[in-house]
Amino acid sequence: MKLLRSYYLLCKPNVVYMMLICALVGMLLAEDSVSSITTIMVALLGIALCSGSAAAINQVIDRNADAAMTRTDQRPIPQGDLSALHASSFALVIGVLGALILYFYINTLTMILTLASLIGYAFIYTVYLKRATPQNIVIGGLAGAAPPLLGWSAISNTIDPYALLLVLIIFVWTPPHFWALAIYRKDEYAKESIPMLPVTHGVAFTKLQIVLYTIILFIVSVLPYIVLMSGFVYLISAITLSSLFMYYSIKLYFSDDDAVAMKTFNFSIYYIFLIFVALLCDHYLIQ
């Protein structure tokens, strides 16, 4: 039982769940009515397996850094519950399985986009960007922003502009989300020589960037209404949620308490979840 739990934790389940929610939103927005439940479940399974594979590869590559950081030292590999070889083999198996499911039961486009996201996160971000530039989150964030597009393409077999707009929302949301956490964990990142923005440019500069990105996010979040993708209910929700995010970011900017950074980080998770819920409610409940 402990071994199964170790493999489960290797996949970063909380991250995968959030990605699946975003993918599901893309699926449900791709059509005016709910598609085949079977198609949705199979697509989510394929995306989940590939996402879990990417997370496992990330933990294999980052195992030494994970062992040295309080936030990650309880992961299966640093704890000795899994070897790097076994974790790598597991990642390969579920990654291939997920890709095959998408190829044979969904469509080739979704498989290609999902594998591109896997490669972007597991290799381009983890191997290179994470330790190469303080803009690692900005550049690498595209891979993490892909789930709505994956879900949309699973239903429509197209790359739709509306799906790309959902990707843009997550892409702009990602830097303030992670930089808030990076402020709270800056000493650990510095110890491992990981060039997160608070380490390379200081906390004050990072706080300013968080404020600027939340302003940009405010603008981007209302675009679905402007392009007639959504209605008034979503607009009110987006304005309210984005205003709250800006409140937290401004509060963080003027605070010397790192705990405020963690509160900002936690709110950002609620933000992205609720704004997508608002999109769904507007799409299906308000006709």
Say what each PLM segment does.
Residues 20-25, 75-78, 138-155, 204, ...:
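Small-residue-rich segments of transmembrane alpha-helices in multi-pass membrane proteins
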Residues 21-25, 29-63, 71, 99, ...:
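Membrane-embedded alpha-helical segments that form the functional core of polytopic membrane enzymes
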Residues 49-57, 119-126, 169-186, 218, ...:
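Transmembrane alpha-helical segments that form the membrane-embedded catalytic/substrate-channel core
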Residues 61-82, 179-206:
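Cytosolic, membrane-interface loops and tails of multi-pass inner-membrane proteins
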Residues 84-154:
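Intramembrane alpha-helical segments
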Residues 246-274:
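Interfacial loop-to-transmembrane junctions
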Residues 277-287:
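Juxtamembrane boundary at the C-terminal end of a transmembrane helix
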